[in-house]
Amino acid sequence: MPLEIDEVQLAAIATSRALGIKRNTSKQMDQFMEQLGEYGIIIDPVADNEWLHITKAMCHNRVIRMPESLYTRICDGEPEAIFIFFHELGHLMLGHQTYLHYSDIEPTQQEDAEWQADEYSKTILSKMGISYMPEQLNLRFL
């Protein structure tokens, strides 16, 4: 679904208010992730040797899966790891569904679920006082 940047940012701000995200949340990410269970969102760390490493993390049906090493980095407060976590949470909160883009025409920026999730994550990290700019990954299927 196409979303303008202000719509994505408003969704992220609403989430941060509802979940009580503050500047010190990055120091308590283990507790924060645990509390998401109260909202029906499950965090599922997977043993690193069982993780397929085709993606850094993934979400589906209110479950965010990630390798244990990423979970540990999130708990340690690493900005990149926290960005990845909120990127995945953004997919859930913005109602993204997993699908492939079947068209000869590239999706617009507003239609790009990855761009939306990045902007969502950047907005929340900004509320936490974290400045992190990710490298955008583009997957091209031939």
Question: Positions of the model-derived regions?
Answer:
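Active-site hotspot residues in diverse enzymes, especially metal/ion-binding acidic/histidine motifs
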Residues: M1-L142
